[in-house]
Amino acid sequence: MQLTTLLTGLISVLSVTTAIPMGSESPTPTSSVSKSLIAHSSSASVSASPTPSPNPYEAYTCPKDKFKACCMSVQQTGKDIVKQLGDLVPVLSGLQVSSAISFQCKNMTEREAPDSCNGQGYTPMCCNTKVEDTGFNTCKPFEDVKKAYYMNNMKDIPESQADMIMDILT
């Protein structure tokens, strides 16, 4: 007797909380108030998000006046050397090398994904000049430049609901 009462109570609570109609087989019409609330909230979320860029490959590009290249960097070369030295001398294993100098750059197009720069010792960079040779160039790692760009340029734009959800999930 108590089991049937418990099951009936659970089913009624579930039907109320999930808003699944139990008795009616035909859908009920939506009220105009809820339609106006939905329309108002969707227009607010659209206006709050930044306008889409005309360039669909914006995530792959460097900021204005910078050029994307796949370069061997002093920083990457230094990391490789320090890693090998760190295996021999453990004190050196935590040492970090930081440098904006890069060499052996190969220019990349806007549409090329940064991940396509995957040769050993090569990393995607945003460089000051568009020089493709074995000479030296002043470059910064692509990820660092993009992160700094978005932190500086997107700080005043409110985050969209989709961005908030992605931040929570990741």
Swiss-Prot record:
Principal localisation: secreted
Null allele outcome, as annotated, is: Affects hydrophobicity only when HfbC, HfbD and HfbF are also deleted. Disruption of all 7 hydrophobins leads to altered germination kinetics, decreased survival under exposure to extreme cold stress and increased mycotoxins patulin and citrinin production.
Alphabetically sorted, this entry's keywords are: Cell wall, Disulfide bond, Secreted, Signal
Signal sequence annotation? 1-19
This protein's source sits in the domain of life called Eukaryota
Indicate whether Signal appears among the record's keywords.
Answer: yes
Localization of this protein:
Secreted; Secreted, Cell wall
| Disulfide bond residue pairs | 62-126, 70-117, 71-105, 127-139
Q: Report the function annotation for this chain.
A: Aerial growth, conidiation, and dispersal of filamentous fungi in the environment rely upon a capability of their secreting small amphipathic proteins called hydrophobins (HPBs) with low sequence identity. Class I can self-assemble into an outermost layer of rodlet bundles on aerial cell surfaces, conferring cellular hydrophobicity that supports fungal growth, development and dispersal; whereas Class II form highly ordered films at water-air interfaces through intermolecular interactions but contribute nothing to the rodlet structure.
What family classification does the UniProt entry report for this protein?
Answer: Belongs to the fungal hydrophobin family.
Entry protein name = Class I hydrophobin E
Please report the organism this UniProt entry assigns to the protein. Penicillium expansum (Blue mold rot fungus)
Could you read off the lineage of the organism from its UniProt record?
Eukaryota, Fungi, Dikarya, Ascomycota, Pezizomycotina
The gene for this chain is HfbE
